[in-house]
Design a protein with these regions (language model features):
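Short proline/glycine- and acidic-rich turn/helix-capping motifs at secondary-structure junctions
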Residues: 1, 37-45, 102-114
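Terminal, regulation- and interaction-focused segments at domain boundaries
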Residues: 1-22
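Short amphipathic alpha-helices in soluble, non-transmembrane regions
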Residues: 19-24, 82-90
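Short, well-structured beta-strand/strand-turn elements
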Residues: 28-38
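Long, continuous compositionally biased terminal/linker segments
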Residues: 42-79
Length: 137
């Protein structure tokens, strides 16, 4: 179950890559294969990718859109992962004057965020049930 949030420059101006790379580094993101990963206990929670083709970050990259992506089934704590993605998105939006959008690049509403959080809670419950079934087997 992929969760995707897009962050798009309000005026479609290009993000300052040096500033963005420094910002991501300060938040603990790790540059891996030309995208940035946010890890916990050496497991990827979510990643930040270039939302424009070719989808990667390089020194000469120019982009006005980035995407935050997480696979909730791979996450150790799906609900917390979504919360951290939203916190990151708000911080990024404030710093880089970006609009938080859904996977279709439509500005996101509180209702959409609540829906994603509910989906994450459902996945967390299912993971817990499967874990309990495995332990009890």
């Amino acid at each position: 179950e992929l969760v995707i949030f897009n962050l798009i420059s309000m005026d479609r101006s290009m993000f300052d890559m040096n500033q963005m790379f420094g910002f991501l580094s300060n938040l603990g993101a790790i540059n891996t294969n030309n995208y940035f990963a946010f890890n916990e206990n050496e497991v990827e929670k979510f990643r930040l990718i270039n939302a424009l083709k070719p989808g990667i970050f390089q020194e000469n990259t120019q982009t006005f859109a980035v995407a935050i992506v997480a696979d909730l089934h791979s996450s150790l704590d799906p609900y917390n992962t979504v919360k951290q993605m939203i916190e990151f998105a708000v911080t990024f939006s404030d710093k880089f004057h970006a609009t938080l959008c859904d996977q279709d690049r439509t500005p996101i509403t509180k209702q959409m965020i609540s829906h994603v959080e509910s989906k994450a809670q459902d996945i967390a419950r299912l993971k817990q049930l499967n874990k309990n079934d495995t332990i009890g087997a």
